């Protein structure tokens, strides 16, 4: 094996490592660090009219409970940005639950559980946002 061949293999490996490392170091790949999430303002008079009904959901209890929570507290869910980012066109955590997307995304489900837990503790929207930012921001 010649020195040129060894260097070309080494160079190829370094280039491959760079291709893998550069995206991993970018803010979009890693998440936002500890910046606050871009939480939307809840829309006045928002309802859960568009949240998927129970008959359209899988039998998994955790999923059904998250959708039920979105139906019970649409004003809170509409003021929280969904930290999973799997559907960036969604306006808020509430709009995630207007589709079947959360049935396969435990990021949405976990965020819903956190919102529900903090609401049961009597936390305000600002406090719930801070808890979401602390966990996911």
Feature-to-residue mapping (PLM):
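Short, thiol/selenol-centered motifs that function as redox-active sites or metal-ligating centers
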Residues: 80-115
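N-terminal secretory signal peptides
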Residues: 1-8, 18-23
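Short Fe-S-cluster ligation motifs
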Residues: 111-137
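Sequence context surrounding c-type heme c attachment/ligation sites in exported
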Residues: 74, 97-98, 103-106, 124-129
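C-terminal segment of N-terminal export signals and the immediately downstream linker at the start
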Residues: 24-65
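Short, charged low-complexity linear segments at domain edges
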Residues: 50-89
């Amino acid at each position: 094996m010649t020195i040129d061949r060894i260097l070309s293999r080494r160079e190829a490996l370094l280039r491959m490592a760079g291709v893998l490392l550069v995206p991993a170091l970018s803010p979009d790949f890693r998440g936002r660090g500890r910046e606050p999430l871009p939480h939307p303002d809840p829309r006045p008079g928002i309802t859960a009219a568009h949240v998927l009904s129970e008959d359209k959901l899988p039998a998994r209890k955790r999923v059904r409970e998250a959708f039920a929570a979105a139906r019970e507290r649409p004003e809170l869910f509409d003021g929280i940005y969904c930290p999973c980012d799997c559907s960036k066109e969604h306006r808020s955590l509430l709009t995630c639950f207007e589709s079947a997307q959360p049935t396969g995304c435990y990021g949405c489900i976990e965020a819903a559980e956190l919102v529900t837990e903090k609401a049961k503790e009597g936390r305000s929207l600002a406090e719930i946002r801070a808890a979401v930012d602390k966990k996911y921001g």
